[in-house]
């Protein structure tokens, strides 16, 4: 985003300045559009990510700390979007290809700056869920819910954490109790008549069916006709 570039560099650098080697200009590598600054070539982007792999985690931490002064709960502006993109567990792992230990280091390095933000705890909870630490995930998701109790995404994450935990443990009695709790929570979300939850209902239905099938197959359960 151009706001981040301007905040960091002000007017010290112009897109038309000769600031790179061999008389090349910034404009040869980046462009400005309605979305802000972006690289002109995907190959350049890939090269930057690969060649700076070891520094990537530190640079993300630096930016997150830098923008933290502008980020607050329920303030959906450009700074909050930057914060969300850089903290999103799925982006860190699948797009930026960071290792799980590096992702965890990022989260805990910015805890002080974002401990009052529900999205921080949500992503930390989803990370712990990804590494199968469902107890830690539950605790972090509860922290997120304590800040934003009516958030659909947070309540969905809590419900699915129970379901995934049930499908992870080997003891049937423990799994049965966990799944029952997660199932009740997920059904409450699915059956809710609130509009903002209605929009995400298909996602919850899909998640519930997926975990239900896994549960039935893992413990060789014969579902009754009502469940089918």
Regions found by a protein language model. Name each.
Residues 90, 128, 162, 169, ...:
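Residue at a conserved register position within TPR or TPR-like alpha-solenoid repeats
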Residues 114-115, 149, 194-195:
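Short coil turns that delineate tetratricopeptide repeat
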């Amino acid at each position: 985003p151009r706001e981040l570039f301007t905040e960091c560099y002000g007017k010290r650098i112009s897109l038309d300045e000769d600031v790179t080697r061999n008389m090349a200009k910034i404009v040869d590598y980046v462009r400005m559009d309605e979305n802000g600054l972006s690289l002109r070539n995907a190959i350049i982007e890939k090269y930057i990510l690969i060649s700076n792999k070891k520094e990537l985690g530190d640079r993300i931490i630096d930016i997150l700390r830098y923008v933290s002064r502008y980020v607050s709960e329920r303030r959906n502006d450009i700074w909050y979007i930057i914060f969300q993109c850089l903290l999103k567990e799925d982006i860190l792992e699948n797009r930026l290809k960071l290792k799980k230990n590096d992702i965890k280091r990022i989260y805990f390095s910015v805890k002080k700056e974002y401990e009052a933000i529900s999205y921080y705890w949500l992503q930390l909870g989803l990370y712990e869920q990804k590494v199968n630490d469902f107890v830690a995930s539950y605790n972090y998701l509860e922290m997120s819910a304590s800040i934003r109790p009516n958030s659909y995404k947070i309540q969905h994450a809590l419900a699915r954490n129970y379901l995934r935990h049930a499908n992870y443990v080997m003891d049937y009695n423990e799994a049965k109790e966990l799944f029952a709790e997660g199932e009740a929570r997920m059904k409450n979300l699915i059956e809710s008549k609130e509009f903002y939850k209605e929009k995400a209902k298909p996602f919850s239905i899909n998640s519930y069916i997926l975990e239900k099938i896994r549960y039935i197959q893992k413990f060789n359960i014969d579902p009754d006709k009502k469940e089918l």
